């Protein structure tokens, strides 16, 4: 057996925690004003009707209603909140 550890093993052994990005409310779900809909880095998804954009690009509902994901042209997506009937 080796009397020294393998060089790699002493330098490895760290891993940062995930940042919990992604979708928090899905299409068709009911939201209240202020609810976070999507956490992201940059505008992967753009804000649509009744959706606000936070400083860190978090999308949140401005009114109470139902979430709807939509397309903006061919390559962009947006999320909107429409009042529940």
Curated annotation (Swiss-Prot):
Gene Ontology molecular function, alphabetical: structural constituent of ribosome
Entry-linked Gene3D superfamilies: 2.40.50.100
InterPro entries according to UniProt: Ribosomal_bL27 (IPR001684)
Keywords for this protein: Ribonucleoprotein, Ribosomal protein
Keyword Ribonucleoprotein: yes
Pfam families: Ribosomal_L27 (PF01016)
BP terms from Gene Ontology: translation
Family (UniProt): Belongs to the bacterial ribosomal protein bL27 family.
PANTHER family, sorted: LARGE RIBOSOMAL SUBUNIT PROTEIN BL27M (PTHR15893:SF0), RIBOSOMAL PROTEIN L27 (PTHR15893)
Protein name (database record): Large ribosomal subunit protein bL27
Species in which this protein is naturally found: Geotalea uraniireducens (strain Rf4) (Geobacter uraniireducens)
């Amino acid at each position: 057996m080796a009397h020294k550890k393998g060089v790699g093993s002493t330098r490895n052994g760290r891993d940062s925690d995930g940042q919990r990005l992604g979708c928090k409310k899905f299409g068709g779900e009911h939201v209240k004003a202020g609810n976070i809909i999507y956490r992201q880095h940059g505008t992967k998804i753009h804000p649509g009707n009744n959706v606000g954009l936070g400083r860190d690009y978090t999308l949140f509902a401005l009114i109470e209603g139902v979430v709807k994901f939509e397309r903006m042209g061919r390559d962009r997506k947006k999320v909107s909140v429409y009042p529940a009937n």
